[in-house]
């Protein structure tokens, strides 16, 4: 074998080695799935997209998280179940759904539990929120961040509901939430369970006298045109959780986990700021459109709170401890 032929063979072997290893500069790309309800335009889903984009950038394209919206991968309950077993890698879901795996989470979503959004944020961002989120780990889920889902209030067609007396016998539409189906009768009203896409028709046909929702949904869904009386009772402040399958989580290096946690926190902060801005815009639009935006006086607010106390009495000891910790962080003014 002459010298030139040996050089050709050596060069060919070197090329084959590079082809097999993919070179040292090309990252090994791994793909993951993220499931979420609502449309891609929903603010929490915009935050999910930002989260996926940031993770891709921060890992130089090595980790590619592909989001699916509109419950494409299943309902919240189904997506969480798949996430537990590693069938779906990440899920954004309401706390109420995740509470099926960690009952302490339900203690963060009780009626009239928070005095303001700042109170909620102190809880979610502090030790209480992190400890409660950590309770998911025993069930195969790793909590990453909380997304703010706004406060919910009552809106009605005929008059403002600024007292329990005004609530009596009203038919109020609500989603299939066991808590709201409990709360509304405690106000003296009737709970009418409806999917979100039937609320507007039910208002038009007088099947219901009102409903409860967030301000952005009140405006974006056109409810403000059908039920122009909005009462700031703020019966609940809501949050979603972004979780990862613990099975998937354990495949990431420590550095990758740190990157993912940082991106989740940044996405949550972005979403919170934009949701609060959306609430202000919705309030201005509704009021300028002629809606009556009513406040509860302190006497009536206390009556509303007292009416739902039986819900607190039926909590487990662990949930009551969470509630006490939440109350300790309430606004002082």
What function would you assign to each model-found segment?
Residues 8-19:
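Bacterial N-terminal signal peptides
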